């Protein structure tokens, strides 16, 4: 699967290079006779962020459109090279999140194992992309003044993002008056929760910088001569399985994790035994019996609880995650200012 995505990224780069060569091959694209079609915009916007992966399975992707949704902010510079094609440089800061406890309750019958697993994460991404924008409908007007009142478009590009997945430790009664309290966010990569880089594991520690391929569709509306409004939804392909810090394979042995990263590594790796949701602070016992019976396919004791021998229901031999890569969707609503609003007439020779 990862090789397939790498091939897709390579083909995308080739496609962009081909499209760019076509644009530059047009006679005198930057000649005085052609600049009449060119102008630039700068934009700022924001929207929602949607994660898909081990904690939001693709088989239930529709839940991910409204569950554990977070936010993003963006800035961009766009240069319209022809009436129907543009190049855009964008920077986005996006927060992604996933939570087994919250997501699995959308369909506990089908996601009982996820409920028992009880993992969660938060990841703040700093994404830099270069994209080509192509109008879906033809535009015949020239320059900024000739742009259409409404124009649907598609975008495809390549880029990089920095990231750092984090999670909270188990909720504890550490409040000022002894009340249940959320714990601070902790970076997960150093803890090697899926066995990355541990003796006997082939998986190497992952990088905090990864490639990304944005594929988007949007609509651009002309507010007036100086401003545009853009609504865009973009799917991000990335050959990476650790946006959520959850890899494939069985849980690493508790003793092995503890020998490398101490008890903290083991505690963040296997979380089926936590009584309370680390994010919601609610007791997991209410649905635990149902999830345990569904997952184990046997009747369990009425007094069963997460803290009562959880390994008998969700053993360390369980798969911590799948081999499928992670991805995300960004919706972005942008206000753009037109930098060049005058048609530049070439000199008569």
Regions found by a protein language model. Give the residues of each.
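Surface-exposed strand-loop-strand hairpins of Gram-negative outer-membrane beta-barrel proteins
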Residues: 47-76
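Residues on the lipid-exposed face of transmembrane beta-strands in outer-membrane beta-barrel proteins
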Residues: 44-48, 75-79, 130-136, 156-160, ...
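Outer-membrane beta-barrel "beta-signal"
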Residues: 133, 324-349
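Extracellular loop and loop/strand-boundary signature of outer-membrane beta-barrel proteins
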Residues: 29-30, 58-64, 113-121, 141-142, ...
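Residues that define the transmembrane beta-barrel architecture of outer-membrane proteins
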Residues: 38, 67-71, 124-128, 148-150, ...
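Flexible glycine-rich, low-complexity coil/linker segments exposed to the extracellular/periplasmic environment
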Residues: 177-201, 254-325
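Gram-negative (and chloroplast) outer-membrane scaffold detector with strong preference
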Residues: 83-85, 91-186
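Repeated loop/turn-to-beta-strand initiation elements of outer-membrane beta-barrel proteins
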Residues: 52, 84-87, 139-142, 226-229, ...
């Amino acid at each position: 699967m990862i090789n397939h995505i790498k091939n897709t990224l390579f083909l995308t780069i080739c496609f962009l290079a081909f499209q760019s060569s076509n644009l530059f091959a047009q006679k005198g694209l930057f000649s005085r006779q052609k600049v009449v079609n060119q102008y630039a915009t700068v934009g700022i916007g924001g929207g929602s962020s949607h994660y898909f992966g081990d904690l939001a399975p693709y088989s239930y992707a529709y839940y991910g459109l409204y569950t554990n949704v977070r936010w993003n902010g963006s800035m961009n510079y766009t240069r319209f090279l022809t009436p129907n094609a543009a190049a855009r440089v964008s920077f986005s800061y996006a927060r992604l999140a996933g939570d087994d406890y919250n997501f699995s309750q959308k369909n506990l019958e089908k996601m009982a194992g996820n409920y028992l697993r009880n993992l969660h994460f938060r990841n703040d991404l700093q994404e830099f992309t270069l994209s080509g924008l192509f109008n879906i409908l033809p535009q015949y007007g020239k320059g900024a003044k000739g742009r259409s009142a409404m124009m649907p478009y598609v975008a495809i590009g390549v880029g990089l993002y920095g990231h750092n997945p984090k999670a909270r430790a188990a909720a504890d009664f550490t409040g000022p008056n002894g009340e249940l309290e959320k714990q601070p966010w902790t970076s997960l990569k150093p803890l090697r929760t899926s066995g990355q880089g541990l003796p006997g594991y082939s998986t190497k520690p992952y990088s905090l910088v990864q490639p990304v391929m944005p594929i988007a569709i949007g609509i651009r509306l002309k507010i007036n001569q100086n401003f545009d409004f853009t609504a865009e939804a973009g799917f991000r392909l990335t050959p990476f399985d650790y946006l959520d810090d959850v890899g494939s394979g069985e849980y690493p042995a508790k003793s092995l994790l503890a020998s490398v990263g101490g008890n903290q590594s083991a505690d963040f790796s296997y979380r089926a035994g936590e009584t309370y949701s680390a994010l919601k602070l609610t007791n997991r016992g209410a649905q635990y019996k149902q999830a345990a019976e569904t997952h184990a396919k046997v009747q369990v004791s009425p007094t069963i609880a997460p803290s009562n021998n959880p390994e008998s229901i969700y053993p360390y031999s369980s798969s911590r995650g799948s081999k499928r890569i992670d991805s995300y969707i960004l919706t972005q609503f942008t206000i753009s200012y037109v930098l060049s609003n005058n048609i530049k007439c070439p000199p008569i020779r």
